[in-house]
Amino acid sequence: VHGHLRESTCIRCYTIYPADATADAVLEREEVPLCPSCGGVLKPNIIMFGEMLPVRVLNNAKREVRNCDVIIAIGSSLEVAPVGDLPMLAKSLGAKFIIINLGQTYADSFADVVIHADVVDVLPKIAAAFA
């Protein structure tokens, strides 16, 4: 929901580029990466603090939640709406709800499974169990 770092998008012309095309500017030259097409700033395809979540992204997430059997909240306090409300929507529709988070959340008492631990430690163990 909050994006990924595999691509960057020009904030002026909305052209999408692979992240490796912008990595040199940021990592080696410590420059703001610019769009080769229009000169606009290239931004990673993530939602930055204070940015609005695109309606399309939220609607897609809600559609997926309505069809899921299990939802896992990983490393989230679940305090920021509207994304923080998605696990409760899934739970209300019959999905199993798992929380993996270092600290407690308001939803701990509603979850089917709660693991209070660092996700860096827990996720490799879960992945190994499915390997």
Report the location of each language-model feature.
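Conserved catalytic alpha/beta core of Sir2/sirtuin-type deacylases, generalized to analogous enzyme cores
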Residues: 1-131
